[in-house]
């Protein structure tokens, strides 16, 4: 138990680095494996390998010593995420790639890194997802879905449904295929101790909260993925696996070149994603635009909808 300076006495989880009583500690909030808020007493000062405490690792999703699947290593974001995971001490990083006939210099550079293993993975192909899940699904501790298709324009500016169908096929149905094949086996391993499956990360968009007409069909596909991810979270929580949704603002990539700053670099997004894993949170909104939109959405969703349509 810990007695706060304000007077009340609390029952808390005690970090292994805390000095014997009587001693001062810092009390912080974390989520346990069921998603419930708990309090943890930490040492006043940082101690070596503080994040390696066994009890704390049960409450967070630190990739250190863990095996991670990144579903798309061809994108700049995917490559930045892979490098961030390696720097954080991931034991093994599987990197998915689709369309092998398309060359990617960034992917070749990743393959040369010691912890990286490339795996063919096409989220539009149920057979590809099923085969990859059969080969490595039982060993994945953290799944990070970075695969997405992003096209600009709304409804009236584009004829046909081909582009919107492709966005939905990757951004929504791709997530569904992953969830159907990887979800059950990861959920069954959520209580395997230090070798347990621990987290599933979805790269969404702040546009999932409120449609941005200039990126209308992309926004719709991310809104669908958000709804599906909430179902996935409910199912994965039963096994103690945390679902983390990342809602970045505009990313500095080829599809946002006409947008003015501020934009989020792939490295900044990867850093925010890594921190979300290490902190064990469920939702994170990286970047100034995402933070501003989130505040406006909380204040008045209807007002935000109207303002974005101007």
Regions of interest found by a model, annotated:
Residues 74-75:
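Conserved glycine-rich cofactor-binding loop
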Residues 90-106:
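Conserved glycine-rich Rossmann-like NAD(P)H-binding loop of the short-chain dehydrogenase/reductase
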Residues 130, 148-165, 188, 192-194, ...:
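Conserved mid-core segment of classical short-chain dehydrogenase/reductases
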Residues 179, 221-222:
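Active-site helix of classical SDR
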Residues 205:
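Residue(s) in the substrate-gating loop at a strand-loop-helix junction
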Residues 210-216:
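Active-site loop immediately N-terminal to the catalytic Tyr-X3-Lys motif
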Residues 245, 253, 257-297:
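C-terminal helical subdomain
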